[in-house]
Amino acid sequence: MDTVNPTRPRNVACAIAGLIAVLVVFHAAGALAELKQEGAGIVKSVVDGDTLILTDGREIRLVGIQAPKLPLGRRGFKAWPLAGEAKQALEKLTLGKRLTLSFGGRRMDRHGRWLAHLHTKSRLWVQGALLKEGMARVYSFADNRAVIAEMLALERESRAAKRGIWGNDFYQVLKAEKIDRRRRGFQIVEGRVLKVAPTRRRTYLNFGRDWKRDFTIVIEARSRRAFPERGARLKKLEGKRVRVRGWLRWRNGPMLTATHPEQIEVLGK
């Protein structure tokens, strides 16, 4: 007769956690090379899944990721799924610990929060660990694009394994040809670019024949300079399958604005 070993699940979980830590440290080695280390601090408290406060009063927004959001006093705001778990994950990684701050772009946001990458004494990359555990998504800006490739790789692995948020429909990757009109906010969308239409003021990446109904990526003229050859190579995306992330809005059909190339991943033909 087979017997059940009650310690096995715990051992397996510990082994998986250990493997994740090793992989994140490996990714951190490459990430550190691209970032400028400057300062350190001890974590006093955690605000939510991507924000914490140091003992010296500095508020740190973990740049490059977006964790599920908590209301944080906002009237009528409903917590996103797994927001509490994401906060707990960040607490487990950082609370009471001394962290090194590293920067790869703009250093402070309009709220006065420091936009930093964080590493523990053992060189564990905090952003990488959260992505690996499925407790955050990659969330980049035109003025903060460092180590995005490394973060996207960790996110892809986590999504494929359906860890954390990737097992919840709220965070599912949307299909460009079938976006529910109730969808709003920060989204990830996949589909095939049918046509690239550059104009003087902006470039449109159309995913269907009817621009009044179908999904479109918009790149403003001022943002084209961030793309290879000032946007001239965008034409090569025609016929390609891509994954794009950003804030979804509805203007005629569903629309998403891209300000930098890291928002658009080319998946193939």
Please annotate each region the language model reported.
Residues 2-18, 23-269:
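Small beta-barrel nucleic-acid-binding modules, primarily SNase/OB-fold domains
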